[in-house]
């Protein structure tokens, strides 16, 4: 049972004398570990990227694919691999919510690291993250840093594949830029406010009517107004647009 082996991992950390606070396991198939990355101090309205990765208790790991279109790959990890990554995060102190600032660093990128717990998620914000640094920020960054390509065959139960979501969040920010085409689906607005833009959830079957997924920030028109539109796959635990606000820095 996922609760038991994640709980055992937390116990092992404590017995090792690593000084981490008591950690509570994630619910079965719940979120275990997630890393969201933001660049610079000024966010573009509606620019809600996929997380670098999100790991779940059933071994599912969804990792963003860099590029102008928001897509992801899905990996299926063994229980041992999930335990190892969870334990590493606990050792780094990521089971306790905190904010780690970078003194004297301007325009820094920010990581938001979320660790699943039975009592609710713990979120750590790291400014100017540098996994090679010797300070507490470096230690925290190392606890969250993960390149899915580094996972070996022994860590996986199946080959990686394209992530095929059942739903998409479509995030629209009004713009004065000319639209290149009309939005063919139900109206983009009004929606849930997300990152100074409006968000609606569409089924994958509806998004397929757009043809190839549009690039993030492409301009569409509806109701006489132009919008910069971002079509973002929703992750397994993201129920609605409001969920996306939880991971903002």
Regions found by a protein language model. Give the residues of each.
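C-terminal active-site/capping subdomain that shapes the small-molecule cofactor and substrate pocket
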Residues: 10
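Charged, amphipathic alpha-helical segments
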Residues: 81-102
